[in-house]
């Protein structure tokens, strides 16, 4: 089993292998390129499609951005991200349509064992010793707003139309149509028509 296949199978994997470093190097290099180009340059956004798993036709990243793999992330139509997006997409990350990210959002679909010698000196079946990681997918539904300084951990699903309040750390699933916030993030209440701001037009 290749190292990337171990990630998707939920097994411990060695992120230092050349197989994985080559995938990450491509994403890191293209992110650096994106981050140095003027935001009015028409070629800037096309760089995203050179490393992302898939993305809709309409999207905008304010930047700077940092994807770990890029190819493990799949984004729908009409996506927007504000400043400083970090995507640790060791496991696959799925983002729906019409999703908005505030500044400093981090998606962390990777983890390390709690036991120290497993974390820093794991002996693998082939005999080599290295650090170890494991990863869990993140699923974000349609029409979700993730506000500033939010961290979303692996294994989490956020339902359609949910709003994640600023500064939250999302460790468990959030249901559709809910306002959720806190550390750890918890569903606070359902979003209703009483939340409408149309009167401000």
Task: Give residue ranges: language-model regions.
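Flexible, glycine/small-residue-enriched loop-and-beta-strand segment within the central core
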Residues: 65-75, 80-156, 183-184, 190-201
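C-terminal/domain-terminus segments
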Residues: 151-185
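Residue-level recognition of short, solvent-exposed, well-ordered loop/turn junctions
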Residues: 8, 139-141, 175
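Terminal amphipathic alpha-helical/low-complexity segments used for targeting or macromolecular assembly
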Residues: 1-57, 114, 185-201
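Extracellular beta-strand-rich, repetitive "passenger/adhesive" scaffolds
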Residues: 59-61
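Short secondary-structure boundary/capping segments
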Residues: 4-5, 51, 130, 136-137, ...
């Amino acid at each position: 089993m290749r190292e990337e296949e171990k990630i998707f199978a939920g097994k411990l994997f060695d992120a230092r292998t050349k197989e994985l470093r080559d995938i990450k190097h491509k994403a890191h290099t293209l992110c650096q390129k994106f981050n140095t180009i003027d935001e009015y340059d028409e070629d800037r956004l096309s760089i995203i499609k050179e490393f992302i798993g898939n993305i809709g036709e309409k999207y905008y990243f304010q930047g700077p951005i940092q994807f770990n793999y890029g190819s493990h992330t799949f984004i729908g139509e009409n996506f927007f991200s504000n400043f400083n997006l970090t995507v640790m997409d060791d496991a696959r990350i799925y983002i729906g349509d019409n999703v908005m990210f505030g500044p400093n959002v981090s998606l962390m679909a990777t983890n390390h064992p709690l036991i120290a010698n497993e974390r820093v000196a794991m002996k693998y079946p082939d005999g080599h010793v290295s650090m170890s990681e494991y990863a869990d997918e993140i699923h974000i539904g349609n029409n979700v707003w993730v506000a500033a300084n939010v961290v979303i951990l692996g294994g989490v699903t956020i339902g359609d139309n949910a709003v994640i309040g600023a500064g939250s750390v999302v460790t468990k699933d959030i249901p559709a149509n809910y306002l959720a916030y806190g550390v750890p993030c918890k569903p606070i209440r359902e979003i209703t028509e009483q939340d409408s701001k149309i009167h401000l037009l």
